[in-house]
């Protein structure tokens, strides 16, 4: 197994700086926010944000390349995560220098580094493992394209050429519009999100119509879940119906965004739908906490 050292740029420092900056902004904002549901959503966002950031910091720090007689490997997270690229599936390779010309679909960087999924001009949809954009090698396979940034670019070019792989440009054929209507994974996500939003919207009305709620119900809470404003059970039901409406708006926006991203990658479309599910689920948990506390 031969190892190739990636060109280490400033990717780790940039991601770490963004992480600390966003965490600082959140800490400052949290001192001024006194609304329970808003603060809980922000707290959950910052938890997932820091997990996301930590993943890319580890990816940047631990990324390395290697190869044997059969495959080229991209390793990160201490070898726990890897991509295997069989040489027999490689069709060609290309080289670029400097800023990535294209659109970031998911991940980090563009100017100085690129980690994640990018739509690169004249190349295609690329899985980027690039810690510095000084020298980027694009490896085109049967069904995927990968971007790497070796410290010694000529070394990689030489062993690719020894395997009779040529340096050439290729035509990027844009994908046709992707239909998600028959995608089982996508359909399950839509079903789950719809059920959660329906529960957020309908359950308060059912409880109100059945007379289960007390006449006086809290309408808003401070950051410690202490009621700030009280109203009638009818006002409570209508207020939470509006929460359901807000979630429907978020869902439809994300739904159409998912169709756009599906042209590049279905995985990106799924991730967007999970965001909608998470937001709706937070509102549902918030409601159940109110029911448990104030309905006896």
UniProtKB/Swiss-Prot annotation:
Record's keyword annotation contains DNA repair: no
The keyword Membrane appears for this protein: yes
One Pfam match: bPH_5
One CC-aspect GO term: plasma membrane
Record's bilayer topology term: Multi-pass membrane protein
Subcellular location: Cell membrane
Keyword list, A-Z: Cell membrane, Membrane, Transmembrane, Transmembrane helix
Chief location: membrane
Residues spanning the membrane: 10-29, 36-58, 112-131, 188-210, 241-260, 273-295
Origin: domain of life: Bacteria
Protein's name in the database: Uncharacterized protein CA_C1301
